[in-house]
Amino acid sequence: MAQQDTDQQHPGVLPVDDEGFVVDSQDCEEREADWRGRGTSRPITVVGNPVLHKECEDVTDFGEEFQQLVADMFASQRTAEGVGLAANQIGVSKKVFVYDCPDDEGVRHVGVVCNPRLVELPADRRRLDDSNEGCLSVPTAYAPLARPDYAEVTGQDEKGNPVKVRGTGYFARCLQHETDHLYGYLYIDRLSKRERKDALRQMAENEPRYPVVAND
């Protein structure tokens, strides 16, 4: 992916390449550590919690309180050893997710997307990958799920600037998975009844390795 020219202007937090997609693979360690260092880890909501099963509210205020939310999300993601986290996974019904995720080439990507929309891709770009998928909100459970191995998301960055993110392989799966969360869908909602039942069985039989919010 080509880097932006040094004289190219972009109002966002991250630089962009020559196609307008964010370059989210630079300074990953420093950026993630900075966010995480300002945050407080929160417990993870699990399947059955109402906040996970409804569409979240758009982010319209990008002020100090929102910046703290993003920092808390990075801290929570690290505690739970996740590669992506949506706000409703820590109980906040806002359309924002964070990610710290490698692609299939091992390149690390770190960023924030608010009010995301998945770009509808033409059929010739929708090659399906049926790898296993898991979710912090369905702890210890995994199931194969077919998703396109390339994804593009449009939205806003943490300051409200327009942003475009794209990913391949595992990172593409992450972008789709986290966007789903913000519209009230878990990955198990895309499984067959039998596969969903098996995922919930896995969850019931094992203990999560991170703090979770108990359902009433």
Swiss-Prot record:
Its EC number is 3.5.1.88. InterPro entries: Peptide_deformylase (IPR023635), Peptide_deformylase_sf (IPR036821). Its cofactor is Fe(2+). The keyword Protein biosynthesis applies. Transmembrane segments: none annotated. Signal peptide: none annotated. One of its GO terms (biological process) is co-translational protein modification. Removes the formyl group from the N-terminal Met of newly synthesized proteins. Requires at least a dipeptide for an efficient rate of reaction. N-terminal L-methionine is a prerequisite for activity but the enzyme has broad specificity at other positions. This is Peptide deformylase 4. It comes from Streptomyces coelicolor (strain ATCC BAA-471 / A3(2) / M145). The lineage of its organism: Bacteria, Bacillati, Actinomycetota, Actinomycetes, Kitasatosporales.
